[in-house]
Amino acid sequence: MRPVVSNDGWMHAESDILTLHHYEQDGKKLYSFYDNFEKLVKGASGNPQYQPFAQGYAYRGQPIIMSEFGGTAYVRDEGSGWGYGNGVKSDEEFLERFGGLIEAVQKMSISGYCYTQLTDVEQEVNGLLRADRTAKIAPEKIAEHNR
């Protein structure tokens, strides 16, 4: 049987996996939203945008995945474009922010995570790769933060 997600990221009803989305760009702030299990399953800071379950539904022991986070705009090569937060303009600045975000989700009581996003798409310059699939940053440097 394959697990089914009822509504990726928020306001789940019946769902086999609890998925969360959060685009805070500061790793310490991101962690503060979900620094204990209760916050993960009840919602972050009372903000309806981050409520994991629709009214009348609650956590039933499902695995928890941060299925979208990050989305940092890296505008060094592209000049301009859209992404979450203030864009970064250097490898060092990107890796510092990326590292903080990865550290935050790795400390959470979750089963997994998926960084947003793999490639740039149209006006979105928040990919780890450019739209032509070439690396913005050496993949080895990205991998260092995921160990």
What is each stretch, according to the model?
Residues 9, 23, 69:
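Histidine- and/or cysteine-centered catalytic micro-motif in compact active-site loops
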Residues 26-27, 31-147:
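Substrate-binding clefts and catalytic carboxylate motifs of secreted carbohydrate-active enzymes
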Residues 7, 21, 116:
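Conserved residues at the C-terminal ends of beta-strands
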Residues 1-17, 61:
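Active-site neighborhood of glycoside hydrolase catalytic domains
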Residues 12-32:
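Short, well-ordered secondary-structure micro-motifs within conserved domains or adaptor modules
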